[in-house]
Regions:
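Glycine-rich beta-alpha junction loops
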Residues: 11-18, 117, 171, 203-207, ...
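Glycine-/acidic-rich phosphate or pyrophosphate-binding loops and their flanking alpha/beta elements
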Residues: 88-111, 124, 243-257
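Hydrophobic alpha-helical bundle architecture
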Residues: 140-160, 167-168, 309-322, 326-341
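Short acidic, glycine/serine/threonine-rich loops at helix termini
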Residues: 12, 18-25, 124-126, 151-152, ...
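Anionic-ligand anchoring segments at beta-strand to alpha-helix junctions in alpha/beta enzyme folds, i.e.
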Residues: 107-108, 112-143, 256-323, 327
Length: 341
């Protein structure tokens, strides 16, 4: 409202929208304190109203259209500072540390991932494991993508960084690289930081699972003398051979997290029962909970897999369970048909 620029708050489609998590919800009174009511009044004043008639969206010729398009520049230039101001207010209230770009990892990291979206939680688990074993790795999380503030990105990258892998959850065929990768390369080039090697990768298209093994593979690639400039993770690309080799990964979930996996048949009630179970645990205990349900578009009659986690610590594991503490198979024929139960 204060910035007077339209916003799109986006997240990783199915992976995030269909996940059940315990979250903290703000009270409306707290939200009201965050809102600049003068800015709200100014916003409403510009709404279509018969008491204040105005004409918009009719026709504009080429003699003035370009000038009008450039006239909005000051609003976009000021927007990152407005966002940062409100992030500061949130941090003050909740004790968080939201920035336009947040760094996570070793303070002297030499290998850094830059990404946004669900892979950031997976990367945090991997970074915790690797730094505990003496590795100098880290990650920059992007919270405000547009307008892109290059100076804030550069200040978030450790001075010791030598190599960067940028991960995009999109594919732009025919381009030199995906959008975030191109933004990072441009920001570094404009700042004269040509000594940092940058590679770009794709992950998670169509909610493809991105397990810790994929993130380990990215850091392994950054350790090589000859790196793939463009790569994919989470799949085996036997056509263009862009995928990175992924090795079995150690368990990196928070200590004490219980992981349960349920195999079922679409329409047999397995998914519904598990949704109720995880909600009961979340509503009536102090446990952190997470549930994600894997099924195809056929739904009824197809294979379903329910992934349930709960524990005493926040759960960052935005990927399928591959080392379950408990497994249930509600369709006996799955066992003899080669499913990886």
């Amino acid at each position: 409202i204060e910035g007077r620029v339209p916003f799109v708050n986006f997240f990783d489609g199915f992976r995030t929208s269909h996940e059940i998590q315990k979250v903290a919800v703000w009270d409306y009174d707290d939200l009201k304190e965050m809102c600049d009511m003068d800015a709200v009044a100014a916003f409403r004043k510009h709404a279509l109203n018969p008491e204040r008639p105005n004409m918009r969206g009719s026709h504009e010729n080429g003699d003035i259209f370009f000038q009008h398009r450039e006239a909005c520049n000051p609003y976009y230039d000021a927007l990152p500072d407005v966002v940062e101001k409100y992030m500061g207010k949130v941090n003050e209230k909740l004790g968080t540390n939201y920035q336009l770009f947040n760094y996570y990892g070793a303070p002297d990291a030499e290998r850094v991932i830059i990404a946004m979206g669900s892979i950031c939680n997976v990367a945090e688990e991997v970074i915790d494991y690797m730094t505990a074993h003496g590795e100098k790795v880290g990650m920059v999380k992007v919270h405000l993508y547009r307008p892109f503030r290059a100076d804030k990105l550069l200040s978030a990258i450790p001075a010791t960084c030598k190599k960067i892998a940028v991960l995009d959850r999109t594919k732009e065929p025919g381009s030199q690289g995906e959008p975030l990768y191109m933004d990072v390369v441009t920001a570094l080039a404009n700042a004269g930081k040509t000594d940092i090697a940058v590679i770009g990768g794709r992950y998670g298209l169509g909610s493809k699972d991105t397990p810790p093994a994929s993130v380990f593979a990215v850091y392994d690639e950054l350790n090589k003398a000859e790196m793939k400039r463009q790569f994919t993770i989470g799949i085996v690309d036997d056509v263009t051979h862009l995928s990175l080799e992924e090795k079995p990964a150690p368990g990196v979930a928070a200590e004490g997290t219980i992981e349960c996996k349920f195999w079922g048949l679409g329409g047999d009630g397995t998914v519904g029962a598990n949704k109720n179970s995880i909600k009961i645990i979340g509503d009536h205990t102090d446990k952190y909970v997470q549930a994600y349900f894997q099924y195809d578009s056929k739904k009824t009659g197809g294979v379903t897999v329910s992934h349930l986690r709960f524990g005493d610590k926040p759960i960052k594991s935005s990927y399928y369970i591959n080392k379950a503490d408990f497994v249930a198979c509600h369709v006996p024929s799955y066992i003899t048909k080669g499913f990886p139960i």
